[in-house]
Amino acid sequence: MCTYIITQSFFFLPCLSFLFFKLVGFFDSVFTAGKSLRIMFELPIFDKLTSCFAAIDCSATSLDIPFAEEELFLMLVSEPVLIPFLFVFEFMLICKPCGSRSRFGFPVKNVSDFEETLEFDPTLLV
């Protein structure tokens, strides 16, 4: 009986320690991601990006972002924590409902065409 308990403990202890370290690693990664997200939202550059998103001219044929690509590159070099946010920012630009642009980013002629193309739900438009 004692031998059985010893052999079982040799089998289960590595498994339990492996699971424990996996769990610790998971919570550490979640904490690190949350910490970097908090840092990102406290950056003044985040305010600049959100104001740029709000200032996009919806009547324009293309997305006119109010800062140059060089300035964006300099922001990325100085604040690399913003890189994941920029993917979200780009997705927000594509999905922003603007006049002749649908919320999915493909052009429509007018709202009636949009209603015929997709099931129109006014609550989806911001």
Swiss-Prot record:
Give the membrane topology, semicolon-separated if more than one.
Multi-pass membrane protein
Its principal location?
A: membrane
Keyword terms of this UniProt record: Membrane, Transmembrane, Transmembrane helix
Give the Extracellular compartment stretches of this protein: 1-9, 95-126
GO cellular component labels: membrane
Q: Where in the cell is it found?
A: Membrane
| Segments traversing the membrane | 10-30, 74-94
Cytoplasmic-side segments: 31-73
Source organism, top-level taxon: Eukaryota
Also noted in the record is: Partially overlaps YBL061C.
**What name does this protein carry?**
Putative uncharacterized membrane protein YBL062W
